[in-house]
């Protein structure tokens, strides 16, 4: 077959000025939706990343039971305290990113009776002979993690009675104390080197965690974040302001927002905002609101 040889062809594009314009119409709503979707996706990714880091940290404690079973076993105070203390340290690090260690001068006690608890506050702080005491309301945490409806708790709306309840509870929690430094009181072994930590992480790479288990970790993290913010008030403003914050969360929010608003963005509590409204049918169309305050404003 005979080949035909062609001469090389060179094309040239010339751009000439012209008054004609190419018009295209854009829908701004579409851009807004894409931007909102991107922001929501980014926030969801940050929430999932924070929760994944927390679950990986708890995995390094080498617990012998699942998270819910640990809190159901009232006799296993060692693991309960280890989980709460490790979670407090995790939240402390997210609240103060440049701080790597949490206080080791805290004593812990688990409470079981109604006289030593405050509804809605499963973790309380008080002072006992100059030492900081953390009281863990184990039954309430179990109900929250298992998502049970608590029909037996007595919530008193009157302010005067609530002040008495808070005072009695904080005093009752001082009667029993257990230190993390007591003789024979050993926390669960944690990794000390990168190789030990990597071994713990490798154990997470070949299985899936159910949504129910993940929700339990998320609930516990939110519980401890809420308690940590009260702890911040206790350490910086004293026991009196701390007790007031237990009764009135508007004071609780205002004190924190005044000086630590930037740090709140690292906590998962800053990702939620909603208001629960209840209509009062006895009065003429009035509505009482129970507001869950948001720090991300």
UniProtKB/Swiss-Prot annotation:
<dbReference type="GO" id="GO:0055036">
    <property type="term" value="C:virion membrane"/>
</dbReference>
<dbReference type="GO" id="GO:0016020">
    <property type="term" value="C:membrane"/>
</dbReference>
<keyword id="KW-0946">Virion</keyword>
<keyword id="KW-1121">Modulation of host cell cycle by virus</keyword>
<dbReference type="InterPro" id="IPR007978">
    <property type="entry name" value="Baculo_ODV-E27"/>
</dbReference>
<protein>
    <recommendedName>
        <fullName>Occlusion-derived virus envelope protein E27</fullName>
    </recommendedName>
</protein>
<keyword id="KW-0261">Viral envelope protein</keyword>
<comment type="subunit">
    <text>Interacts with host mus209/PCNA, cdc2 and cdk6.</text>
</comment>
<dbReference type="GO" id="GO:0019031">
    <property type="term" value="C:viral envelope"/>
</dbReference>
<keyword id="KW-1120">Modulation of host cell cycle by viral cyclin-like protein</keyword>
<dbReference type="GO" id="GO:0044071">
    <property type="term" value="P:symbiont-mediated perturbation of host cell cycle progression"/>
</dbReference>
<comment type="function">
    <text>Acts as a cyclin-like protein and plays a role in the modulation of host cell cycle. May promote G2/S arrest by interacting with host mus209/PCNA, cdc2 and cdk6. The cell cycle arrest is characterized by an intact nuclear envelope, concomitant with sustained activity of host cdc2. However, viral DNA replication still occurs in the arrested cells.</text>
</comment>
<keyword id="KW-0472">Membrane</keyword>
<dbReference type="Pfam" id="PF05314">
    <property type="entry name" value="Baculo_ODV-E27"/>
</dbReference>
<keyword id="KW-0945">Host-virus interaction</keyword>
<comment type="similarity">
    <text>Belongs to the baculoviridae E27 family.</text>
</comment>
